[in-house]
């Protein structure tokens, strides 16, 4: 299997490369349109600023390339945000794969510090609270011990037997498992496209899915065995 990782001006790429290597696959880090189109799977990762990232993608024609991909594609962190229609960060028009508008967190409590940085549970029961007790804001720092369970559920999308269901991304992940977040902006909930949600000052999309496009706000490559399972699930999704 050929896994391509989109090469652009975003950080945190090498942790994704190493995570894929741990699964026994040597990924291709590339900005070549033909190589991306021919890959069996494409990962669109990164941390960065939306307007700078979109400017880079447009200058190299990668915006059109990504939108035209037919194989399973996984956006991570800013990759998820750039898949949306627009971002408040830099008042940026994005790829428009998903219709949502990316918003900045506006915390109302002193203890809610932006960016959200740490371990948080993803919630899929629709009960509106993915947080658990940790460092005072419902999360655990990267160097803290992470509890084994909280709440995990799917939001919006219906669980079914289809091999291309968004639920496939979470197969084998235990209810309430924790994942790692670092972000100041969020994708709002959407009844059709949100497949997992989290809570930090409000409920938002922790993962979204449309056709062959999957995306997570959290970092599976930094989320231990849970994140590894999610990456395994993505690589196993039928084309």
What are these regions (language model features)?
Residues 48-123, 232:
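Cysteine-nucleophile active-site neighborhood
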């Amino acid at each position: 299997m050929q896994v391509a990782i989109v090469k652009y001006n975003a950080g945190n790429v090498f942790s994704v490369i190493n995570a894929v290597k741990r699964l026994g696959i040597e990924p291709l880090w590339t900005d070549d349109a033909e190589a991306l189109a021919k890959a069996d799977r494409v990962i669109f990762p990164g941390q960065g600023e939306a307007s700078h990232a979109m400017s880079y993608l447009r200058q190299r024609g990668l915006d059109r390339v990504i939108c035209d991909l037919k194989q399973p594609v996984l956006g991570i962190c800013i990759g998820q945000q750039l898949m949306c229609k627009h971002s408040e960060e830099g008042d940026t028009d994005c790829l428009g794969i998903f219709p949502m508008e990316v918003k900045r967190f506006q915390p109302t409590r002193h203890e809610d510090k932006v960016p959200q940085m740490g371990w948080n549970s993803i919630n899929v029961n629709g009960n509106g609270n993915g947080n658990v007790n940790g460092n005072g804001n419902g999360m655990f720092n990267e160097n803290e011990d992470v509890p084994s369970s909280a709440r995990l559920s799917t939001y919006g999308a219906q669980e079914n037997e289809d091999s291309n269901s968004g639920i496939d991304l979470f197969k084998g992940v235990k209810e309430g498992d924790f994942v790692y977040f670092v972000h100041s902006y969020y994708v709002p909930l959407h009844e059709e496209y949100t497949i997992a949600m989290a809570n930090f000052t409000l409920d938002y999309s922790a993962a979204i899915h449309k056709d062959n496009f999957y995306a997570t706000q959290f970092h599976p490559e930094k989320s231990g065995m849970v994140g590894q399972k999610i990456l395994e699930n993505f690589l196993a999704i039928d084309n």
